[in-house]
Amino acid sequence: MATYNGERYVREQLQSLYEQTERHWTLYINDDNSNDRTVDIIREFSDQHGNINLEINRPGKGALHNFMNLLQRAEANYYMFCDQDDVWLPGKVEQTLRAMEGQERKTPGKPILVFTDLKVTDENLHVTSPSFWHSNRIKPKLLSSLNYLGVHFLATGCTMMLNNPLKQLAFPYPDTAYLHDAWITLKAVTQGGILCPLADAQILYRQHGSNVAGSEDLRRNYILHRLATITTVVRNNIRVYKLASNFNYGSWLKYLYYKVLYYFKELHS
């Protein structure tokens, strides 16, 4: 888990972890030098339960480096990523682990990535979309090849479980990796790994003011909103293309071609 000024939600997330039906795990936390009560809350849980490994970073590392540092620091058979503001349903770890172990029996020694859908909620955990995959046009079967995976994200970090063979492939990583979950997914696809999507959503994916900040102000000015939207879309696509380029994706023209093609295929599937 990577944390930063998460006092409002982190207690609820931690509680959901300790209510899991599968309890054989250790929680590693990197805190990005929070200046609220986040660390105090974490230490309270650590005192009660004892299986939390907390490290406080120098500020400003960012999500990519925080999560990758956590992955590198931990030593286990399997690894999951956790956001500070979500809530895990009680069977999340058990269900994901069961799928991982089943796939390992079929393909021993292979890099494996198991991931699930999510239930999108508002800040009070009222479900606004029962399927993140549906609302974000995610088609796991279509996104199983580099051509499409290079233009559209597939696995969300907080739903993922990876095994040790896949962890070994994840390092080293460049700054252009952009997002830890996208980097690991692309590594799995391009290095002979196996993707195991589970459609059953086992997480409440909270959307709140901190991750939609500024949207209402932009809507007050249509032109400003449109310009900001276009700028964001262009900037994000440049980042995604740079990420895909680490895997010899090809030209910018190819990227645009498969970007458009994916949306046409998704609309008619």
Regions found by a protein language model. Give the residues of each.
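Nucleotide-sugar donor-binding/catalytic module of glycosyltransferases
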Residues: 1-217
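Membrane-interface aromatic/basic loop that binds lipid-linked glycans or pyrophosphate carriers
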Residues: 242-269
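Catalytic core of nucleotide-sugar-dependent glycosyltransferases
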Residues: 135, 140, 204-247
